[in-house]
Every structure is written in C-alpha cells, then in structure tokens.
C-alpha cells in the first residue's frame, strides 16, 4: 500500500494498491494560495491536509516515505508529519528534480523555508532526478553542505523502460522486494 498525492483517477491500480486524494490548493496570480474547491480558510485547509497525511502514514506504517520536491510539503504541511514518521523509524527521502531555478533563487527560497534545517533533522537521503554531467545540482544548490544526508543523482526517468519488482532475497515481496529497471519490452 502507498499514499499518493495527485490525481490517479482513471488509472487501473493493481491489487493491494490504493490512493488518497488530498483537498487541493490553487495558486493565485499574486503567488499566494487558496483552497481550490473547499470553502474554508487556507490555514484550515493546510491543517486538514497535514492531518490526513499523518493519519494515512500512521495507518500504512511505511518503511520508506519519498517527499516530492518540497522538503516541508506545500505550505509546510509536513512539519508535524516528518518528525513523527522519523520517530517511528520511517526512512525519509527527498526526491528533487535537477533544475529548479537559478542557484541564487533556490538558496533564497530554501533559506526562507528553512529547508536545510528540516532536511538535517528528518531526512535520510536526497535523490536527484537528473545527471550531474548535465547539471551539477549538488554543488549549485549547496546540497554538499548537508553532511549527514546521502545525496545521490539517480538519473532521468525513461518512460520507455519498464519497471519490474524483483526480490533481492529470492523470496516474496514481503521479505525484501526492490524495484529494478528492465530493458525488456
């Protein structure tokens, strides 16, 4: 089981897989956020999303949590979730695309959002979706200064490659399945 943020409607999910759709934000032209559909104050929506995420993760008890792009979540909604999951022993990884903005803009944003602090306190690793031969994200964004966190470029996703689950122990999924790419059609 896993928790997915985003739209998965219309996608056939395999047995044992489900999704939770969170109430959405809408970004206004001035850059501020509001509730997309619900008639509630933004602070209440942030709290609702945070509580929903925490409840789902508590129920699922994942070994691995991959946070996409924004270390503290949209509008800091993961601020209570991450320390709780960390205390439960969940391995927490930030998935980060290689080119976000200029290094200066990223440095300002990360400083304002206190991203380095939450990374040091709650994350085990950063996976960079990119190739350092194309763009050196680690140096450009100062990720090399996160001493206790493993920062790894994992390459680009190729939609033409298929993923298949293989067990690293030769057994079933419950005793150590890992995902590997395969060149098979």
Regions found by a protein language model. Give the residues of each.
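A nucleotide-sugar donor-handling region in carbohydrate enzymes
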Residues: 97-185
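Short Gly/Thr/Asp-enriched flexible loops that form oxyanion-binding sites at enzyme active sites
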Residues: 75-85
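Active-site proximal beta-strand in glycosyltransferases
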Residues: 83-99
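Short, well-ordered alpha-helix to beta-strand connector turns
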Residues: 16-17, 62, 89, 122-124, ...
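Conserved nucleotide-sugar phosphate-binding/catalytic loop shared by glycosyltransferases and other
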Residues: 2-44, 48-50, 55
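Structural motif
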Residues: 66, 93-95, 127
């Amino acid at each position: 089981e896993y928790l997915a943020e985003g739209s998965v409607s219309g996608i056939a999910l395999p047995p044992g897989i489900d999704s939770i759709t969170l109430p959405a934000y809408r970004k206004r032209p001035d850059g501020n956020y509001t509730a997309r559909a619900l008639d509630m104050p933004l602070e209440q929506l942030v709290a609702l999303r945070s509580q929903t995420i925490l409840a789902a993760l508590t129920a699922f008890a994942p070994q691995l949590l991959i946070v996409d792009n924004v270390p503290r979540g949209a509008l800091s909604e993961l601020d209570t979730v991450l320390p709780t999951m960390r205390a439960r022993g969940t391995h927490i990884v930030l998935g980060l695309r290689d080119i976000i903005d200029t290094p200066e803009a990223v440095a300002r944003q990360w400083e304002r959002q206190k991203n380095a602090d939450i990374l040091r306190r709650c994350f085990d690793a950063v996976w960079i979706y990119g190739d350092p031969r194309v763009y050196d994200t680690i140096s450009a964004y100062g990720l090399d200064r996160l001493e206790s966190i493993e920062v790894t470029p994992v390459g680009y996703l190729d939609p033409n490659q298929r993923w298949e689950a293989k067990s690293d122990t030769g057994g079933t999924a419950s005793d150590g399945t890992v995902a590997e790419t395969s060149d098979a059609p």
